[in-house]
């Protein structure tokens, strides 16, 4: 838990992940300005938080290194649903987790979460989020 690695800014692409303000984010857009007379090229990175959905942006030299989260994508079964939490059990380790319904579940699937279904969850930086329902053809 809490795993992250370093990656050079020039290697980042939209759709990948980055840590901004200690929050794992999915990169939405990268704009690179050409090097000027007195400086190196700079990249403006716009990203959306995985857990809070907030848009964040940073400007870094393309030669700089940034933290990238290591995201563990796993399958779990929903054991119980309460008004404010979802209890899930990992299908490999049989570990139990309590996930808050407001911040730990993707908006589109909140109303579809029910006991007994399998879900895909992401674990990164000590936090868990249920991303999608497994086995659902849409």
Curated annotation (Swiss-Prot):
InterPro entries: IF5A-like, IF5A-like_N, NA-bd_OB-fold, Rib_uL2_dom2, Trans_elong_IF5A_hypusine_site, Transl_elong_IF5A_arc, Transl_elong_IF5A_C, Translation_prot_SH3-like_sf. GO terms for molecular function: ribosome binding; RNA binding; translation elongation factor activity; translation initiation factor activity. Its main location: cytoplasm. Signal peptide: none annotated. Pfam families: eIF-5a (PF01287), IF5A-like_N (PF21485). It is found in: Cytoplasm. The keyword tRNA processing does not apply. Transmembrane segments: none annotated. PROSITE patterns: IF5A_HYPUSINE. The modification Hypusine is found at residue 37. Keywords: Cytoplasm, Hypusine, Initiation factor, Protein biosynthesis. SUPFAM superfamilies: Nucleic acid-binding proteins (SSF50249), Translation proteins SH3-like domain (SSF50104). GO terms for biological process: positive regulation of translational elongation; positive regulation of translational termination. It comes from the Archaea. GO terms for cellular component: cytoplasm. Belongs to the eIF-5A family. Functions by promoting the formation of the first peptide bond. This is Translation initiation factor 5A. It comes from Pyrococcus furiosus (strain ATCC 43587 / DSM 3638 / JCM 8422 / Vc1). The lineage of its organism: Archaea, Methanobacteriati, Methanobacteriota, Thermococci, Thermococcales.
């Amino acid at each position: 838990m809490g795993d992250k690695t370093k990656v050079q800014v020039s290697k980042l692409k939209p759709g990948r992940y980055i840590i901004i303000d200690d929050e794992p984010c999915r990169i939405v857009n990268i704009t690179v300005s050409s090097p000027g007379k007195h400086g190196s090229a700079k990249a403006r990175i716009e990203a959306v938080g995985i857990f809070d959905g907030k848009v964040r942006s940073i400007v870094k030299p393309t030669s700089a290194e940034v933290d990238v989260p290591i995201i563990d994508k796993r399958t779990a079964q929903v054991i119980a649903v309460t008004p404010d939490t979802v209890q899930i059990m990992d299908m490999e380790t049989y570990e139990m987790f309590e996930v808050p319904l407001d911040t730990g579940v993707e908006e589109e699937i909140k109303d579809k979460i029910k006991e007994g279904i399998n879900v895909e969850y992401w674990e990164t930086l000590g936090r868990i989020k249920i991303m999608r329902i497994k086995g659902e053809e849409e």
